[in-house]
From Swiss-Prot:
Induction: Down-regulated by EGF and TGF-beta. This is Guanine nucleotide exchange factor VAV3. It comes from Homo sapiens (Human). GO terms for cellular component: cytoplasm; cytosol; immunological synapse; plasma membrane. Residues 400-502 form the PH domain. Residues 592-660, 788-847 form the SH3 domain. Residues 560-847 are annotated as: Sufficient for interaction with ROS1. The gene is VAV3. The modification Phosphotyrosine is found at residue 141.
Amino acid sequence: MEPWKQCAQWLIHCKVLPTNHRVTWDSAQVFDLAQTLRDGVLLCQLLNNLRAHSINLKEINLRPQMSQFLCLKNIRTFLTACCETFGMRKSELFEAFDLFDVRDFGKVIETLSRLSRTPIALATGIRPFPTEESINDEDIYKGLPDLIDETLVEDEEDLYDCVYGEDEGGEVYEDLMKAEEAHQPKCPENDIRSCCLAEIKQTEEKYTETLESIEKYFMAPLKRFLTAAEFDSVFINIPELVKLHRNLMQEIHDSIVNKNDQNLYQVFINYKERLVIYGQYCSGVESAISSLDYISKTKEDVKLKLEECSKRANNGKFTLRDLLVVPMQRVLKYHLLLQELVKHTTDPTEKANLKLALDAMKDLAQYVNEVKRDNETLREIKQFQLSIENLNQPVLLFGRPQGDGEIRITTLDKHTKQERHIFLFDLAVIVCKRKGDNYEMKEIIDLQQYKIANNPTTDKENKKWSYGFYLIHTQGQNGLEFYCKTKDLKKKWLEQFEMALSNIRPDYADSNFHDFKMHTFTRVTSCKVCQMLLRGTFYQGYLCFKCGARAHKECLGRVDNCGRVNSGEQGTLKLPEKRTNGLRRTPKQVDPGLPKMQVIRNYSGTPPPALHEGPPLQLQAGDTVELLKGDAHSLFWQGRNLASGEVGFFPSDAVKPCPCVPKPVDYSCQPWYAGAMERLQAETELINRVNSTYLVRHRTKESGEYAISIKYNNEAKHIKILTRDGFFHIAENRKFKSLMELVEYYKHHSLKEGFRTLDTTLQFPYKEPEHSAGQRGNRAGNSLLSPKVLGIAIARYDFCARDMRELSLLKGDVVKIYTKMSANGWWRGEVNGRVGWFPSTYVEEDE
């Protein structure tokens, strides 16, 4: 057996990989093991499995998403622990890039073999490897760097299911809630609803008792042993939680015992706003536990006092460290308790009311989960900040990270490519030069001043570091060209830049006269449209800098007319004037993005507008008017006739909104897009290709129309893509918002949905070499092409993705659920061929 296969078996015995992991499949290759270990997460867990607490998993990045910076940090953490804890010599270790770039995977296997023979590893009783003679064929490792370059990791697997118990504190919570069960009367089996109500009441009572015990048995005795700063750091806002839950417990008890639970739904709705103080608690609980650990190690008197307090509180069963995690568990249970109650409520009015309470508690749970997730992001950002030299600005101001990695850059007036490492955020790109394990900042690019454009001509060179795209300055200053190592990496970078730019300039940011911009809200805030909370700790949503309206990204298009159309009116929020090269920009330099209206009837000035309004604006049917001022209740609006340039007032019923013209999309970087092409040329392209090879072409005789050409049963078939009302479709029963969505959907679903005789999916893009498509299919295996569907859900709300891992939803979307493992309230699923993560509280699962 080859060494890499023996290594995989050893990792399974160490409980790092599950027994059915893809490295055990008959089709498995050394590539699969390399890809699995490449981000360093499993290696860190391996050391913890061999000796507990070798590495603090809170200090590594459990979801590095193949960020080069975060993966290398994980790998270096593993290598350091191999020396310091396992006594290995540096000469026995691989280098970080040997694994990340798989430039010497043989050395990685050798290091793991030596690790398996260390005294600590042998003490576990697990046999080291290799256990048998094997031919060490170095040739199998030679092609790995190229293979890694060709294959981007999709976020498709529950890779860390067996690794890390994110549900920290869950067992403690369950133990505490069950402690009183023996003393409670049993619920009748035929009345599950009564059981649900009893559980809500009893667990609230027990939880309040737990909070009170923290206050009585830990806070009061420890006050004289800790400094004020230490005390606040450990106990955060527990006194506020105690007061809150005493009141909540009383109201729940009163509703269930005295009012036949008729107002229970209202209790939870009323308390949603008050329960958001859990955001503060959940933000601080991790550092509270770290502070407690540090104080216990450095102050012997505190350590002894903690043990004494624990014995008095619960006979030593639970430590303060255990109990600090319980509040985070409780606040995430309310929606689950209400969900059960709704399920077993039959009265239509009661059910509808309880659903309102359920929505409120789901919103609260998602808010808390996003606070937790943002705390992970802030830890990443802090690591970036500490590793980049000469960086004097707080990285936090640049928004959330979208990706990082190596790239080559030229300015558009020079042609020398410079090797750089870039960190891409929502609002900026930090361009760095790598210096050992750290980075030297060379430039910060403000993305608010740029737009992105593909350079399709570079794709024809077909060699490494030749795949380019442009970053173009919107005010005509010198731009940049970025070069990527492979075509796939270029596609990924383009998507990440486009996502960042869509966060800066989202659709509908200026609709209804608004001026919405990404914003960090210092107080808990709700969306003006859906009334749900803006979630997280920074850049939670969008603020109109004219009227102060607040909204989610997905809700921007549904905000009512701006209350301050004229930016000079009282109460308007103003942005500081932007300057370019020290000169104030004139209005002509900026596209104000004002709404455009189409004139539907002539207007020559009769009837005239009111005298105090101003002069009439003459219009001809078909003219386009730029709307300057007006609201839904005004008889006359002010605008500029783009044909004459004149400004004046006109009847509001003389115009209608201009039809939305979608921006032209550049598909040239897609491996399936052929550009303008006729049927005969398409048939020539496909004639010598395998069946299910396809292309999408622009039909030259029909402007704006597309067609799919696919080889099926050794013949080229052609399918016209119909466009109507802004949607694309080949079958009337399934429509898509973009050509990209349509192609993605039919990659996974047979074309027979629209054409009975055409039973195939879109499998092989015609630009992709046949061998690479085949290899990728073989490596992926059937299970990745067809993930196991755990259930079906319906989207209850719109959701707009903030990065490439997330899945945008529209209300009513049917979602296939693939994963529910995330403890942060996110599930993984598919909508119309698009796969990604979405908030579980935004969907309702079919029973």
